[in-house]
């Protein structure tokens, strides 16, 4: 990664910090939208995985992983502020001295809160509409997450952050829509490795 790329990410960090300070509501709504996108991808991924779970579980995991990449694709192409991707962007900005660590922390906090609100709203709508049809879609999935030892959960979260940030970086660096699409899908399909995405766990 050359310094021009570092500067590009650092400038993005400065722009995010400026937006939080000058138009908090706009930034917060962008974070809420990212929460919506995460929920859409998570719900779709789990429903697709459940369809294959009994007959072809290996395909269920693979297709579910591909489907989950919809979240980062939507954020990259439509727009949104995802906490996980902001970890990389704001850290670059802070190390490059384009923003302070305090400013980075503010962006992290607002984006995390916005992601939580977005996930909560869409989850309530999903349950209220009875769209899941049955709790079986998520019962086993949630139980598996809760049974993972703390140490394993931590390292899976680190892996997740790496892969999501890689997808976000590809989305920023590549110019063609086809290239961005392909690299984001390949990067974010980390869910096949049972890594854990921060916002998705909300």
Describe each region flagged by the PLM:
Residues 10-27, 98-99:
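Cytosolic juxtamembrane amphipathic/interface segments immediately preceding
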Residues 30, 34, 106-114, 118:
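Alpha-helical transmembrane segments of multi-pass membrane proteins
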Residues 115-134:
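Transmembrane alpha-helix/helix-exit interface in multi-pass inner-membrane proteins
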Residues 191-198:
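Conserved small/polar residues in nucleotide/adenosyl-binding loops
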């Amino acid at each position: 990664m050359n310094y021009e790329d570092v500067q590009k990410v650092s400038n993005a960090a400065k722009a995010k910090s400026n937006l939080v300070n000058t138009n908090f509501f706009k930034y917060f709504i962008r974070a809420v939208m990212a929460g919506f996108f995460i929920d859409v991808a998570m719900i779709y991924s789990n429903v697709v995985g459940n369809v294959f779970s009994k007959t072809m579980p290996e395909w269920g995991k693979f297709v579910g992983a591909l489907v989950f990449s919809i979240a980062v694709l939507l954020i990259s192409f439509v727009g949104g502020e995802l906490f996980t991707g902001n970890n990389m962007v704001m850290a670059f900005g802070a190390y490059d001295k384009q923003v302070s660590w305090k400013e980075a922390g503010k962006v992290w906090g607002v984006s995390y809160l916005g992601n939580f609100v977005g996930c909560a709203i869409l989850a309530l709508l999903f349950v209220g509409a009875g769209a899941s049809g049955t709790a079986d879609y998520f019962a086993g999935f949630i139980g598996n997450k809760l049974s993972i030892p703390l140490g394993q959960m931590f390292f899976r979260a680190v892996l997740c952050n790496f892969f999501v940030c890689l997808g976000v970086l590809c989305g920023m660096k590549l110019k063609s829509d086809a290239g961005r699409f392909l690299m984001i899908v390949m990067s974010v399909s980390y869910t096949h490795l049972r890594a854990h995405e921060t916002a998705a766990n909300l």
